[in-house]
Design a protein with these regions (language model features):
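A ligand-binding cleft/hinge motif common to bilobed small-molecule-binding domains
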Residues: 129-132, 261, 267-284
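Conserved C-terminal helix/tail region of periplasmic/extracytoplasmic solute-binding proteins
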Residues: 372-409
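Mature extracytoplasmic/periplasmic domains
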Residues: 304-378
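Short, low-complexity disordered leader/linker segments with a strong preference
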Residues: 1-72
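Periplasmic-binding protein-like
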Residues: 152, 234-243, 281-305
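A bilobed periplasmic-binding-protein/Venus flytrap-type ligand-binding module shared by bacterial periplasmic
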Residues: 178-185, 220-223, 297-312, 328-331
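Extracytoplasmic ligand-binding site segments that recognize negatively charged/polar headgroups
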Residues: 73-84, 108, 119-120, 124-264
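Early extracytoplasmic/lumenal segment of secretory-pathway proteins
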Residues: 48-132
Length: 409
């Protein structure tokens, strides 16, 4: 009996070992299967060598790599006009530290450079002030051989009269100044610049803090050229503008959309991108091209004469404006795009992104919203009827005086 018991125990032990072996074999197969399944997911996870932003975006490699000795880059740019992850990607990919100062008006940037602000490598002048800065020797000619990224641009945005041959500038973004209003609160929407002088709009308006644009639209209401140098016409514009300014609740070039979204202003004048973003969050916001014609403009990159890190500046221009990087502007600051490569990259691209308000979407949907909106995709008749602000030469002090006196009244 004892022997039989021992035999039974031995048989039971052998059976347990067999079961254990089968279990281990099964677990090994499961482990291999999971690893194989995980392989597909791993392809979507950035490799250890990939450069990934704090938001989880995997940065593209440079399309136009170059040797750069400088370790920093100093930008002097418009407020809220460069996506943070665009800067972060450039820093990760290049190893160059980006320092950013901001301004709210071309005149602010011009004054600082004129006063000897020579620490900057790149600035963002709007078209009309480029010729003035060139004339005063504040900018250096660009070496186009170092800018292969120029191939990315729609030729409609190159070779403007303010910079023939793009000797000094490379396009950044374009757009319009036009009328904006909230359809839920404005019973009689304005159709012309002249309408903004109506008493019913007093205390409800927001205007850009932009002297040339505001004086320019005032000149248009009088039937004059936005670039007039005639002192008598400018005096007349000054008197008319003095009637308008007390009715303006807020002058803001940093974030005019904020007041429109919050309901602190019901109408006024603003830029393309600000109107588009306001409308995305508040659909009742409408954008109207005035009967006298909108103000047309283009912002550009330019290099100050004594830029201390020009090699880093060229690296920034080539990287930030390649198509798989500059698409970020469609998300954050959707103005009119001179960069055709970024539009081509975005079209039909199902990459998951967040919009400017943090809502999940795809890059293709951002493109569709851009291309289907008459705000960002400016209609041909609005361009034909529009006006570009130019350098007025010796008449500039007259414009400055008007703005200072009228706003200070």
């Amino acid at each position: 009996m004892i022997r039989v018991a021992k035999d039974n125990l031995l048989k039971e032990e052998e059976m347990n070992k067999s079961k254990l072996f089968k279990l281990l074999a099964f677990l090994a197969v499961v482990s291999l299967t999971l690893a194989a399944c995980g392989g597909a997911a791993a392809t979507a996870t950035p490799a250890k060598s990939a450069k990934v932003t704090s938001t989880g975006y995997e940065c593209p490699e440079p399309e136009f790599p170059a040797q750069v000795a400088s370790k920093e880059l100093n930008l002097f740019v418009w407020t809220q006009y460069i996506p943070d992850d665009m800067i972060e990607c450039f820093e990760l990919v290049s190893g160059i530290k980006v320092n950013r100062d901001e301004y709210s008006a071309n005149e602010e940037m011009y004054a600082k450079l004129s006063a000897g602000g020579t620490s900057y490598d790149l600035v963002q002048p709007t078209d009309y002030i480029v010729s003035l800065m060139v004339r005063q020797g504040l900018l250096q000619e660009l070496d186009q051989a170092k800018l292969p990224v120029l191939k990315n641009f729609n030729s409609d945005y190159l070779n403007f009269p303010f910079d023939p041959g793009n000797k000094y500038t490379i396009p950044y973004q374009a757009g319009t100044d036009a009328i904006v209003y909230n359809a839920d609160t404005v019973e009689n929407p304005p159709k012309s610049w002249a309408d903004l002088w109506k008493p019913e709009y007093a205390g409800k308006m927001i205007f850009l803090d932009d002297s040339r644009a505001v004086i320019g639209l005032t000149l248009l209401t009088l039937g004059y050229d936005v670039n007039t140098k005639d002192p008598a016409q400018l005096d007349e514009a000054k008197a008319k503008l003095a009637e308008l300014v007390p009715n303006v609740k807020l002058f803001d070039s940093d974030s005019p959309k904020t007041a429109l979204i919050a309901g602190d202003a019901d109408l006024g004048m603003t830029w393309t991108g600000e109107a588009f973003l306001a409308q995305q969050e508040k659909p009742s916001i409408q954008y109207v091209y005035p009967t006298e014609g909108a103000i047309l403009w283009q912002d550009n990159w330019a290099m100050p004469k004594d830029a201390p890190h020009s090699d880093a500046a060229y690296a920034w221009l080539n990287y930030s404006m390649q198509g798989d990087v500059f698409w970020m502007m469609l998300r954050d600051w959707p103005y009119t795009q001179p960069n055709q490569a970024s539009l081509d990259y975005a079209k039909g691209n199902q990459m998951q992104v967040n919009d400017a308000n943090g809502n999940p979407t795809t890059l293709a949907k951002l493109y569709d919203a851009y291309i289907n909106s008459p705000i960002t995709n400016t209609p041909a008749d609005a361009i034909k009827n529009g006006h570009r602000i130019d350098d007025v030469g010796d008449a500039l002090p007259l414009y400055d005086q008007i703005w200072t006196e009228v706003k200070g009244q």
